[in-house]
From Swiss-Prot:
<protein>
    <recommendedName>
        <fullName>Proteinase inhibitor type-2 TR8</fullName>
    </recommendedName>
</protein>
<feature type="signal peptide">
    <location>
        <begin position="1"/>
        <end position="24"/>
    </location>
</feature>
<feature type="site" description="Reactive bond for trypsin">
    <location>
        <begin position="157"/>
        <end position="158"/>
    </location>
</feature>
<dbReference type="InterPro" id="IPR051391">
    <property type="entry name" value="Protease_inhibitor_I20"/>
</dbReference>
<feature type="site" description="Reactive bond for trypsin">
    <location>
        <begin position="29"/>
        <end position="30"/>
    </location>
</feature>
<feature type="disulfide bond">
    <location>
        <begin position="52"/>
        <end position="95"/>
    </location>
</feature>
<feature type="repeat" description="1">
    <location>
        <begin position="24"/>
        <end position="81"/>
    </location>
</feature>
<feature type="disulfide bond">
    <location>
        <begin position="31"/>
        <end position="116"/>
    </location>
</feature>
<feature type="disulfide bond">
    <location>
        <begin position="40"/>
        <end position="126"/>
    </location>
</feature>
<keyword id="KW-0722">Serine protease inhibitor</keyword>
<keyword id="KW-0677">Repeat</keyword>
<feature type="disulfide bond">
    <location>
        <begin position="119"/>
        <end position="137"/>
    </location>
</feature>
<feature type="disulfide bond">
    <location>
        <begin position="56"/>
        <end position="91"/>
    </location>
</feature>
<comment type="similarity">
    <text>Belongs to the protease inhibitor I20 (potato type II proteinase inhibitor) family.</text>
</comment>
<keyword id="KW-0732">Signal</keyword>
<dbReference type="Pfam" id="PF02428">
    <property type="entry name" value="Prot_inhib_II"/>
</dbReference>
<feature type="repeat" description="3">
    <location>
        <begin position="152"/>
        <end position="209"/>
    </location>
</feature>
Length: 223
């Protein structure tokens, strides 16, 4: 019986270890010599406690944790209409008992009216709506160089007549210089550039525990 219990404990430990590796992949500590600086969002966050939610119903942009600060998951749902904050997809209303609190971005937004744009040319991070507040789409384009704010991909210049206004994040950014990092170890949300302002890549790593706000994949310094 004792051997059986030990075997179960070992199996449980291996499952937890495998789960940790699933969330994180190894990054080298080498400096990418092309990278000179990064432009990163300067975000405030709020801690939301006493939650009854689950990973599916949790809000996109929020990270959910257990009582001891262990990362559980990222939220998967987002609002689809300015008029009602319903989930985009069907999720159960059951509470995930592992989740104790969430860390969510505290974002200001701006309403942009009188638009002539389309879903392809619309800005990433913006949500576009019809005149009556019905959700149309998320913008798909982002700037690819600090020097010129061109679209990342080829989009038509035609107006999507369904789109009347957009809700866009009002973000502050910070410029981080003197970096020794690489694309894998760079922070998610940051864009990395060469000395002449040419876009190199987006960072790929994010923190997974509130108690330990280090990079998920590496200890390469980014700030």
């Amino acid at each position: 019986m004792a051997i059986y219990k030990v075997a179960l404990l070992l199996l449980f430990g291996m499952i937890l270890l495998a789960s940790d590796f699933e969330h994180a992949k190894a990054c080298t500590k080498e400096c990418d010599t092309r990278i000179d600086f990064g432009i990163c969002p300067l975000l405030e966050t709020k801690r939301v406690e006493g939650l009854c939610t689950n990973c599916c119903a949790g809000k996109k942009g929020c990270k959910y944790f257990s009582k001891d600060g262990t990362y559980i998951c990222d939220g998967e749902s987002e609002w689809v209409s300015e008029k009602n904050n319903n989930l985009k997809k069907a999720c159960t209303k059951e509470c995930d008992t592992r989740i104790d609190f969430g860390i969510c971005p505290l974002l200001e937004t701006k309403r942009v009216e009188g638009l002539c744009t389309n879903c392809c040319a619309g800005k990433k991070g913006c949500k576009y709506f019809s005149k009556d507040g019905t959700y149309i789409c998320d913008g798909e384009s982002e700037w690819v160089s600090e020097k010129d704010n061109n679209l990342e991909k080829d989009c038509t210049k035609e107006c999507d007549t369904r789109i009347d206004f957009g809700i866009c994040p009002l973000l502050e950014t910070k410029r981080v210089k003197g970096l020794c990092t690489n694309c894998c170890a760079g922070k998610k949300g940051c864009k990395y550039f060469s000395a002449d302002g040419t876009y190199i890549c987006d960072g790929e790593s994010e923190w997974v525990s509130e108690g330990e706000n280090d990079l998920q994949k590496s200890n390469v310094a980014i700030s």
